[in-house]
Every structure is written in C-alpha cells, then in structure tokens.
Amino acid sequence: MVIEGYKFSAPPLLLGVVLMALEWYWLGGLLLFLGAFVLYFFRDPQRVAPADPAAVVSPADGRVVEIVDEPWQGKPGRRISIFLSVWDVHVQRAPVEGRISRVDYRPGRFYAALRARASAENEQNVITIASPRGEMMFKQIAGWIARRVLCWKAAGENVALGERVGMIRFGSRVDLWLPPEAEILVRRGAHVAGGTTIVARWQ
C-alpha cells in the first residue's frame, strides 16, 4: 500500500463508520465503499523482475495504446505508450537497471490520457535512466482525472530493474522511449504489468 492511500481513504472510512453508527446506512455505506476503493487504487503489490539481463520491463501496469517511431533529443527511437485505467496499479517502476541521470518536471495541460497530444502537452515527469547497455527515458503523464505525478527518485540515484520510482494518481498514461538497440516485443492492445512484463530486449 502506498502511503498516500491511507491519507486519502481515512476521511471517507471514518465518516462512513460514524454515519453507520447514526443509522444513516445508505450514505455511510457509500462512503465506506469509496474509502475501500481508494485503498484498492493505492495498492502496491510485490513484483519480481525477470532474471534476464537483457530485459526491458514495462514501467507501468496498463494497456499498450501506441507504438510509434519517435526521435528523442535528436536520437532515433520508438515510443511505447501505456494507458492506465482507474483499475490498474498506479505505481511506476524502473524499466532497466541503471542510474537516473535526469528528472525533469514539466507543467502543462490535463488532456484525456488517450489523446495523442497528451504525450507532449500534459503535465509530466520525464525520467532518464543511463543503463550499462544504453540510455532510456520514460514519462509519467498526468490526465484530466490524474492531476498529480510523483517521482520518488532523484538524479544520481541508482535503480534496480523493476524498482519503484513513482506514481500517478487516479489513472493516466506512461510513455517509454526506446533506442534502436532495443527490440520491442509487445503489440498494441497488449496488457502489461509494471516491473514484470518484458516489453523489449537489448539486442
């Protein structure tokens, strides 16, 4: 459980208990259900990263909605976009082992996460990881519901494959940029699990 889950679930749960004691069952039950859903949303299950040293794992749970050629900082590469619904785990994980070379927060808009312009224009954290095999970048992108992106790591920190690095609240999108040296193994429409699903492999 992510610590924010207790903070957001406590008010509706406590108020729900009080209302149930006062025999306001309908409203009390609704608040208890809301509090339970918040606890479910902020769940943080244990994940075991694959032992494959050439693996690139998904940074997030969700559905692959786009795979496109896209340069980054003048370098050729491909982008995998993953949509997180409110039912998915919202903790993001390191796609590769390495050192975080940059964390750039970019303020922006709050378009729906499925819109193509969300990748470029929405509020986001851009996290760059320098791994022994090459550099990789992924974005935590806010949406029209998810208006807070949290990165728990700082530039200069080392991360293990599949290690927790941050979270997006209440559904949004994560983009993963891969250099040509990484062979993409997933297709559009595939459901992926953060820290465990191998989405690419270093060649």
Where on the chain are the PLM-derived regions?
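Contiguous, well-folded functional domains in the mature portion of proteins
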Residues: 1-203
